[in-house]
């Protein structure tokens, strides 16, 4: 609905993971059902992101997605974001592509920090939600390949990645936790 407000007459393409998602986990919904859902919600074309990209980090997922959209000569990319602050995310994306940032990131990784924590520390403890991190990776990918794709972000109003239920919506992590708990019984 938000995308329709921004681009009512454009073709909407969704690049989605297939049967395997980040961390190589099987998707809770098979790719055909996900496609049906996307089409029923106003998407015009669904493209499966190859598992090589979809089963890896946000950085690799974003690179694969942006490369696909760029090859299709898409004009825009729209993504969800907790902060909904595109200017801030663009600034961070630019900083994160510098040699100084890379050195700082490597130092924190060498100290044993997880990638998200090391990334945050390298940015002077800038706190980013999981959707902001993916948004940042889309922006980095656009910059890296020098794409003309224009980015837009939409505020994530519902739950965050690790949140429990809120207003009848649950995060992906919470849904996986419920399913795992059910399987243990």
Question: Model-predicted segments: where are they?
Answer:
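N-terminal cationic-hydrophobic initiation segments that often serve targeting/anchoring roles
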Residues: 4-7, 39, 69-70, 143
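Active-site cores that bind ATP or allylic diphosphates and position pyrophosphate for catalysis
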Residues: 49-185
